[in-house]
Amino acid sequence: MWNGLTDDYHPTQILADFLTLQEHFGRLRGLKFVYVGDGRNNMANSLMIGAAKMGMDFVLDAPSQLWPSEELVQLCHSYAAESGGSITITDQPDAVEGADVIYTDVWCSMGEEDKAAERVKLLRPYQVNRELMERTGKKETVFLHCLPAVKGNEVTEDVFESPASLVFDEAENRMHTIKAVMVATLGRQE
């Protein structure tokens, strides 16, 4: 059985994300990976786990009302201690400083449409826009999003369509990584 997506986790997406970063940077270990937005959704949970296991410096920048469970954070701290990575949970705008990667996801997950207006108001300060990208202090910072994106909410069109955006490479890599999972798990090839 494969977990393609649940309310809590999205592991196959993380494989595509990390392949995209490996292709772009040539490494994962030591990258500063900042997730901005709803910090308790399936993408934030899975990215934090994956980044912790791969030795990345993971920063979750979200309003405290949308932080992940303390149990998951502690588990990820233990993974990071083993891999040489780190986990930081914050609500501060300067969290993006020095980021190699900025990642966001939709502000209103599937099944939460009734909370859309409240989420937009709460998360507006966490929008990935040109100003946020400039606050990284790096011209080489890349942008990722698992798609589909609501341009104008979690990310502005100018960032989404910019050279920093690797979202289409990331989307293509979903096909390759999911095929790899299938080949690796469907049984022995004769």
Say what each PLM segment does:
Residues 23-104:
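Glycine-rich phosphate/diphosphate-binding loop of Rossmann-like nucleotide-binding domains
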